[in-house]
Structures are given as structure tokens and as C-alpha cells.
A protein has these predicted regions:
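Basic- and hydrophobic-enriched, low-structure N-terminal and domain-boundary segments
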Residues: 1-97, 101-109, 114-116
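P-loop NTPase motor domains
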Residues: 70-75, 80-365, 375, 383, ...
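A short beta-strand-to-loop transition that corresponds to the Sensor-1 phosphate-sensing loop
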Residues: 125-127, 370-374, 401-403
Length: 406
């Protein structure tokens, strides 16, 4: 036994010496068990290159216990951003590269499954697997909104308009909805997009004043010929009415550009004609909203991946309303909130994301954007805007990179 032990010690010592001398491995990288299997090959990297490529992790980022934003492991310790350090993050990597299964899932597991609940979260959960794996079923502090699952929560788009809201609040809340649902995919379309938003805002204000809820208002817009609807509303309105200034300029117009604006509006709203969406926004008795965070809740927007293209307007609406509400959050709040926007590059343009990244750190709100590459992001945002997005994210995690510019 003694001879075997001596042979084993000699074998591992030789292999570790070889790894240091010929492979460029650092002495402080040698751990228990290293050297049992020899590292083959001659010197591939100089010690200087290895130090540059694999720098030591600062002790402040290391933890024995999983907590905060989990980035990985180093020498049997977790590499994490402490929960009290509020940074924005972007996670890049193609499909199957581990964006969801590593940083996103590990971070949420460390928060919910361990029972720490150090932060609340708003998470876009493509496939619906994140909340299933990271939270306990029937947790009263976790709200799951899934338009394809009628046992989940709905969404209250008019959450700010209950009671007796002022005219200014009505306009502000409805303009947020318009900006989220009707978006530009081409800078040349700005004229049509802006006018479609104005038209939609005016019609929503009119129906809200008539006592209609959000989903019924949208479907009345979809079910009626827009030009005749606006003409009828204006003929029965006074210039002092709240909706009048939004709709008057469209009444009686017959040029083709107005028709294009109307088409832009109805195309953007077509998803609300589906029965699952009507149930989510109207009939579901339990609805989540950005006010749910004030009650200590976390929200997961879950959706099957094959439905993402059809329902991305819904995800965008809920996300933009949440971003705007976070901007109104008091700086005195002590509980951090983590906003996870998975598949950010596939959701369409979010106007509020730039302000969010610029202002939310002071509100103890951290934004985490996950997308495939800068090239994917530049399909929606300009090259300069994409640079602004990434520069505002202090922590960048690259799981995979095939695009040279990324």
C-alpha cells in the first residue's frame, strides 16, 4: 500500500509538473485530484497568455453559497454579482448555447428554490420552463401569465385607470399602451406609425370614457370600419372632449396615407381578436399588473416558443408597462427587482428600453437582456442604438459567438 501511494504521488507530481512547465498552467490552478490524468500535448499557451485569457476572479465576486446573479464557478466557488450591486446585463449566444440554462436559470434558482427571495423578478419565459424549474408550484408570491393556459393569471392593461382617474392620467396610460403595441419596423414608416398611434389613442380614450374595458374597446375598433367609426365619433363629439384632438384630423380625410395609417393600426391589433387573449385581458378573475410588485409578487410571462411570433405584441405590452412603472418607482424602495427580457431581439422595438437602462439602477431595478447576437439586435434597432444598449449593460456574458462584430 505504501509503495502504491508513493507511485501515485510520483505520478501526479510528474503530471502536474508537466502541466506547469509545458502547458503553461499556473500553480494556483492545481487542485485536489489534478495530475491523475496527464495533460497531453506540448506547450500551447505561454503563462502570460493564460493570465490574459483567464484572469483571476476578484474575491468580491466569489461566494461559497449561490446568491445574486450567478455567472459561473471558479475553484469550487460561485462567481456572482452580489444582489446589492445593481448592474444591467446582456447575455449573448445562439440557440442552444446555454443562455437560459446557465445564467438565467441559475440566478432564479438561487433566489426562489433556496427560499432566499432576495429579489423580485419580472421574467419573459419563452417555453415556460424557467418558472417551472426555478420556483415552487403554487407559490403565492409567484404569478405566471400564459395566454395559452387559462389556469394561469391574466393581465390588467388598465391597472392605473381604476377608480376615477384624471384626464392626464388617462392620456398617459393609454399612450403607453399605444407605443407598446404599434411599433416601427422601418424608419421610413415613422409617419404611419405615429399617426396610427394617435388614432388608436383617441379611439381607446373614447371607449374608456364610454365605460368599456380594454379588450372590448380594441375589438370594437377591429370590428368596425375605421374611417366611418371616426367620422361617427367626431360628429357626436365636442372639441372639448378628451378624444377629439386625437381623432379630428382623420375625420373626412380620403387620401391614401390615412388609409395606410388605419391599416397599420388594425394590423398591429389583430392578436386581440383571439379568444385566449380575450380571456387573458378580460375574463380571467386573477390578473397580474406592474402594481403586483408592490404586493411582493414576482411575474413570469410564459409562452410556448412556437407562439412567440403570434403573441410578441402581448409580451411587448406587458414588458413596456412594467418598464414604465419601474421608472415611477420610488428610490426609497429597498427590495431589488430583476427584469429578465429573454429573446429580446425577437420581441420588436421597445421604445422604453433606453430610458430604463439609463435610469433604473437608482430605483434598485436591474435589467437583463438575452439575445442571440448584435446582428439580430440591429435588425430592430440601428447600429448606434444597439451600441447604446450594450454599453449601458455593465455585465456582458457571451455564451457563444459566431458573428465577428459581436
Amino acid at each position: 500500500l505504501a509503495i502504491m501511494s508513493l507511485i501515485l504521488i510520483a505520478w501526479t507530481s510528474f503530471n502536474n509538473f508537466w502541466a506547469v512547465a509545458c502547458e503553461g498552467k499556473r500553480l494556483d490552478e492545481i487542485g485536489i485530484g489534478d495530475g491523475l490524468v496527464p495533460e497531453t500535448g506540448l506547450k500551447k499557451e505561454s503563462p502570460e497568455k493564460r493570465i490574459a485569457m483567464y484572469p483571476k476572479v476578484p474575491p468580491s465576486l466569489l461566494s461559497k453559497e449561490p446568491e445574486g446573479i450567478i455567472l459561473g464557478k471558479y475553484k469550487n466557488r460561485y462567481v456572482r454579482i452580489p444582489i446589492n450591486e445593481i448592474y444591467h446585463h446582456c447575455i449573448l449566444g445562439g440557440s442552444g448555447s446555454g443562455k437560459t440554462s446557465t445564467v438565467l436559470l441559475d440566478t432564479l434558482l438561487a433566489n426562489f428554490a433556496t427560499g432566499r427571495n432576495g429579489f423580485q423578478t419580472f421574467c419573459i419565459d419563452i417555453k415556460g420552463e424557467i418558472h417551472e424549474k426555478s420556483t415552487y408550484a403554487y407559490d403565492e408570491n409567484v404569478l405566471v401569465c400564459n395566454p395559452t393556459d387559462r389556469t394561469s393569471c391574466g393581465w390588467d392593461a388598465y391597472y392605473r385607470l381604476h377608480g376615477n382617474p384624471s384626464d392626464d392620467l388617462i392620456i398617459e396610460a393609454i399612450e403607453e399602451i399605444s407605443q407598446a403595441l404599434i411599433i416601427s419596423t422601418n424608419p421610413k414608416d415613422n409617419f404611419f406609425v405615429e399617426n396610427a398611434r394617435t388614432m388608436f389613442t383617441g379611439l381607446l380614450i373614447y371607449y374608456f370614457k364610454q365605460g368599456e374595458n380594454f379588450i372590448d374597446s380594441v375589438n370594437k375598433i377591429l370590428e368596425t370600419e375605421t374611417k366611418s367609426l371616426i367620422a361617427e365619433i367626431i360628429s357626436d363629439s365636442e372639441p372639448s372632449d378628451l378624444h377629439y384632438k386625437y381623432l379630428a384630423k382623420f375625420a373626412g380625410r380620403k387620401n391614401e396615407s390615412i388609409e395606410d395609417c388605419m391599416s397599420e393600426m388594425t394590423t398591429s391589433l389583430s392578436v386581440f381578436s383571439k379568444s385566449d387573449i380575450k380571456f387573458m385581458f378580460r375574463d380571467n378573475y386573477q390578473k397580474a399588473s406592474p402594481y403586483s410588485f408592490q404586493e411582493g409578487k414576482s411575474i413570469f410571462l410564459a409562452i410556448p416558443e412556437h407562439m412567440l411570433e403570434s403573441y410578441k405584441a402581448i409580451l411587448r405590452l406587458c414588458t413596456v408597462q412594467t418598464l414604465k412603472e419601474m421608472e415611477r418607482r420610488s428610490e426609497e424602495e429597498t427590495t431589488p427587482i430583476l427584469l429578465i427580457i429573454d429573446e429580446f431581439g425577437r420581441l420588436g422595438r421597445m421604445e422604453g428600453i433606453f430610458n430604463a437602462l439609463s435610469t433604473l439602477r437608482s430605483k434598485k431595478v436591474s435589467v437583463m437582456l438575452a439575445f442571440q447576437s448584435l446582428a439580430q439586435c440591429e435588425v430592430i434597432y440601428s447600429k448606434e442604438e444597439t451600441r447604446v444598449l450594450t454599453e449601458n449593460c455593465r455585465v456582458k456574458v457571451v455564451c457563444e459567438c459566431a458573428d465577428g462584430e459581436t
